[in-house]
Amino acid sequence: MPIIEQVGAREILDSRGNPTVEVEVGLLDGTVSRAAVPSGASTGEHEAVELRDGGSRYLGKGVEKAVEAVLDEIAPAVIGLGADEQRLVDQALVDLDGTPDKSRLGANAILGVSLAVAKAAAQSAELPLFRYVGGPNAHILPVPMMNIINGGAHADTGVDVQEFMIAPIGAPSFKEALRWGAEVYHSLKSVLKKQGLATGLGDEGGFAPDLPGTRAALDLIGTAIEAAGLKVGSDVALALDVAATEFYTEGTGYAFEKETRTAEQMAAFYAQLLEAYPLVSIEDPLSEDDWDGWVALTAAIGDKVQLVGDDLFVTNPERLEDGIERGAANALLVKVNQIGTLTETLDAVSLAHNAGYKTMMSHRSGETEDTTIADLAVAVGSGQIKTGAPARSERVAKYNQLLRIEEELGDAARYAGDLAFPRFSVETK
């Protein structure tokens, strides 16, 4: 059994220049592995809690307290445990914290240890992480949901929708899907320049032009897809992350595109978009606590498009189970730092798949060079991954890892393609 011998931690910087936690785990057999923890910009109220230092250092965003939690409390609790006993290790972490939202030790401290333990166990077993976590049948390469126009909390513009994504569903392989996405991305830059629009980048590597609204952004992307020699819809479909919680006020409604709208009016807006554009997925179209609106929206258009719960579910099995019972959404966004351990993440994915919900593995806007989520996407067979534009090394690192995995799988590799979106029919677009 690969026994945990050492646990270390340090404060490093993420892609936004903010501190985050990196954990190193050493085993008795000499294996050493590390994991770095991401951080979000638009965070759900129900997420597990990051531990930040406050004060003036790093403008209050330091993580020395989380590092101390790893060194002083977590390390003594897990040293001597088997790294291949992931569920036991993660339960020990949850029990040690003792709070429902991991606020005592910090989800950033706990997750760093959880992931580093899994990576060390895989390395000790001489298995790639995707194979160690996913077993012998892990072979599905996900569709890269590339965020090529950034708005909302990811950019300083007037665009309310947070992410405009492309999904290269018609590609024959992940390698080709990545090429198509990169070509559309560069094509979009040329389109923006020709129209005199800004080509500065948002947090996730997408362009951040100031546009009049959602349709203008979708039209620009459609033009870029065609300019790249690809077909809008059958080759490259479109997707949104609205992040509606960011512009929702209880009792007032949704302050969206210079109007105050009800959930019903937002639903009508999305229905109109579906008639005009080949959208395969809409994430967080309504606020995280607007359960009635979610249920009505799912009943209205859930048979036509993937409706993804991010802030709604926060990768939490309890909230997901509630949503399944209510009939809210039909897909789960998977962010490991929302729940705080690998075991709980895998439990949420299993619950979603068993209920017929799709899953999309996801990065955060504050990322590092850590590529764990690329392996997890293949391990759980999510068929979709959201990890930014094909630009900025913290985003590209995940795509490059998926290229390596596809190459390692060889003839056994299968690219999810349009099978990842069974509700989408290009003939109707």
UniProtKB/Swiss-Prot annotation:
EC number: 4.2.1.11
Cofactor remark: Binds a second Mg(2+) ion via substrate during catalysis.
Cofactor(s) required, per the database record: Mg(2+)
Binding site for Mg(2+): 241, 283, 310
Gene Ontology molecular function, alphabetical: magnesium ion binding; phosphopyruvate hydratase activity
Gene Ontology annotations of biological process type: glycolytic process
Associated pathway: Carbohydrate degradation; glycolysis; pyruvate from D-glyceraldehyde 3-phosphate: step 4/5
Coiled-coil annotated residue ranges, if any: none
Ligand binding ((2R)-2-phosphoglycerate): 162, 335, 364-365, 386
UniProt cross-references to SMART domains, sorted A to Z: Enolase_C, Enolase_N
Job description of the protein: Catalyzes the reversible conversion of 2-phosphoglycerate (2-PG) into phosphoenolpyruvate (PEP). It is essential for the degradation of carbohydrates via glycolysis.
Name of the featured protein: Enolase
Native species: Mycolicibacterium vanbaalenii (strain DSM 7251 / JCM 13017 / BCRC 16820 / KCTC 9966 / NRRL B-24157 / PYR-1) (Mycobacterium vanbaalenii)
This protein's encoding gene: eno
